[in-house]
Amino acid sequence: MSLQATPASDAWYRSVEKTSQTDDERIKDITVLPPPEHLIRFFPISNTPVEGLISQTRKNIHNIMAGDDDRLLVIIGPCSIHDPAAALDYARRLKVVREQYKDTLEIVMRVYFEKPRTTVGWKGLINDPYLDESYRIDEGLRIARQLLIDINRLGLP
């Protein structure tokens, strides 16, 4: 949802005290993002196998780092996710390897949605999910949350 800065729609915005007359002179548009609670409620994991997987994996990692588990922690994955279908394909393949080596390795898929060192061009799935410079961050957040849950539903943390 995009709100043009109009007297009616920016009342909340103008209620913030400005420090000078030049504050925010270049703002042309304000896009409201969903609060994290909306994504959590729309994609719940409470009392699901996904929640159990995440909780158990965190305990396993803690035990490995504390020296109470002899397995090796392996965090592996692509530099940046841009294609959810390809990410799920990768996750399915990695899940097989995770099962194969579960006695010696704790394999966790690295899932990163941004391009932190990119100064020009595409900034990542969350910032530009459709690769068209539309910057639908609200959609990027939704797609990212759904993808993370889909990966976890495969049994892969």
Model-derived features: where do they sit?
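Hydrophobic, well-ordered secondary-structure segments
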Residues: 4, 64-65, 86-89, 127-130
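Short, basic, glycine/proline-bearing loop/turn elements
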Residues: 46-48, 79-80, 131-134
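Generic secondary-structure signature for well-ordered alpha-helical cores
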Residues: 59, 66, 95-103, 149-156
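Short glycine-rich or small-residue beta-strand-to-loop segments that form or flank ligand, phosphate
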Residues: 71-83, 108-112
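Glycine-rich anion/phosphate-binding loops
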Residues: 81-101, 134-146
